[in-house]
Amino acid sequence: MKLTENPISRRKFLSNSSKAGLAVGLVGSGILSACSNEAKGDAQAILATSFTQTPLSFDFGALEPHIDAMTMEIHFTKHAAGYAKNLGEAVGEENVDTNKPLEDVLAKISNYSTKMRNNGGGHYNHELFWQIMTPDAAERPEGDLAEAINSSFGSFEAFVEQFEAAAKTRFGSGWAWLVVGEDNKLSVGSTPNQDNPLMDI
């Protein structure tokens, strides 16, 4: 399913994505359940992204056995750091107001360069990924998130199946997402490369 087939307002995405346990990138119940069950306060903190790389709040090996330390280190120090560096260059070249959050740029990314789109998306997606992952995850979501998953997909297992399919069938690189729609139902989709559901593309 393309995300454009299930329109989601930016406001709804921002206010509900933490509550929905926005799941990104990698698949498997161990990784998916690492997402936060908390709602609005965390959403505002998570979704006011700066234009610079935030230090990682846990050791590179903290997510093992789901993600090994070397993969985390390379991803954080090379890939994500590269997106942040190149985003900084694009921001300077295009005179972007960095006093506002990156989300404001992503919401109007069609007005900016390909460099801004690729690196702004790459930086945002990775910053979100680092913030919503935790070494102390439960086996599966609980509380409101569990109820929302069951209501939207029928069961946690059905959700995992759809999420894994979205990730595995994305040609090349990209991200799988769990988002809240206008109808307050959760849905799964994917975006190519470093695009994300906040972008007006």
Model-based region annotation:
Residues 195-201:
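Short, intrinsically disordered, charge-balanced linker/junction segments flanking boundaries
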